[in-house]
From Swiss-Prot:
It comes from Equine arteritis virus (strain Bucyrus) (EAV). Gene3D superfamilies: 6.10.140.90. It is found in: Virion. It comes from the Viruses. Belongs to the arteriviridae nucleocapsid family. This is Nucleoprotein. InterPro entries: Arte_nucleocap, Nucleocapsid_C. Keywords: Ribonucleoprotein, RNA-binding, Viral nucleoprotein, Virion. One of its GO terms (cellular component) is viral nucleocapsid. The keyword RNA-binding applies. The keyword RNA-binding applies. Residues 1-24 are annotated as: Disordered. One of its GO terms (molecular function) is RNA binding.
Length: 110
């Protein structure tokens, strides 16, 4: 009975339901290999996802959810997540401090 537990993430993708990415492996599974640079001495920008990595279109809430999860994992100050036809681009501005800020833009209404 070693394989009693099924793989919920695989089943969720098969059923078309998207679950929140909660770990680095989930992010890699969804968006492919990401490139991350260590925080430099002064604030700069880094793109940790290449165009074309997006497996599906993200709606506004999924963008906020993924943005929140990515920020929580990388312990960054603030960032912005944009999804378009080219793919996913997550741009972060590193802040030279150990304080963790969570800054997720509210969904844009019509």
């Amino acid at each position: 009975m070693a394989s009693r537990r099924s793989r919920p993430q695989a089943a969720s993708f098969r059923n078309g339901r998207r679950r929140q990415p909660t770990s680095y492996n989930d992010l890699l599974r969804m968006f492919g290999q990401m490139r991350v640079r260590k925080p430099p001495a002064q604030p700069t920008q880094a793109i940790i996802a290449e165009p074309g990595d997006l497996r599906h279109d993200l709606n506004q809430q999924e963008r906020a959810t993924l943005s929140s999860n990515v920020q929580r994992f990388f312990m960054i100050g603030h960032g912005s997540l944009t999804a378009d036809a080219g793919g996913l681009t997550y741009t972060v501005s590193w802040v030279p401090t150990k304080q963790i800020q969570r800054k997720v833009a509210p969904p844009a209404g019509p």
